[in-house]
Amino acid sequence: QPKIERLMTPKRTKPGTKDTRKDWEKYRNIFLGAHRLNLGVQFWKDNETSLERAREIYHVDPAVIIGIIGVETRYGENTGNWKVLDSLVTLSFDYKRRADFFKKELEEFLVILYKNDLKPFDVQGSYAGAVGLPQFMPSSIKRFGVDFDGDGKIDINHSTADTIGSIANYLSKHGWVEG
């Protein structure tokens, strides 16, 4: 999948050409538009119990969790449409610069498939292999994923409770301090 490789390679501005990177003024409208803000308010209302529980356990402000989910997937509207297995295989073997990293992610992904009895080609995510509402890489699911809804499995694709708990756990384990 050469398209994946193109997406993973940063664009370089050629001398004498205009830099097309967006400044904050232009970029802000993408993340702070009315549609996304309305989705965020509704997501917060729908998941208030899990958000407050995450605050109590992990000491992470619900607004931070809400912000991450909003930026990553627009509250689940866009979790990616790439077959994660295809992406990780391609990046593991055809993207030499980071092949070792993606081979480890592929291994973790295969374990997740097996443990959760998932069909390999059904799981979709980003072109880099990130999945679910928080767009976690497979190794992050393994290390920081939480069964926050108590159903016996970690499901950041369909369980908003697991997503909230996993994000809070991730931040906590990375040194998040409330306040």
Predicted regions and their residues:
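Cell-wall glycan-active module
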Residues: 1-124, 129, 139-179
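Functionally critical loop-and-helix segments that line ligand-binding/catalytic clefts
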Residues: 135
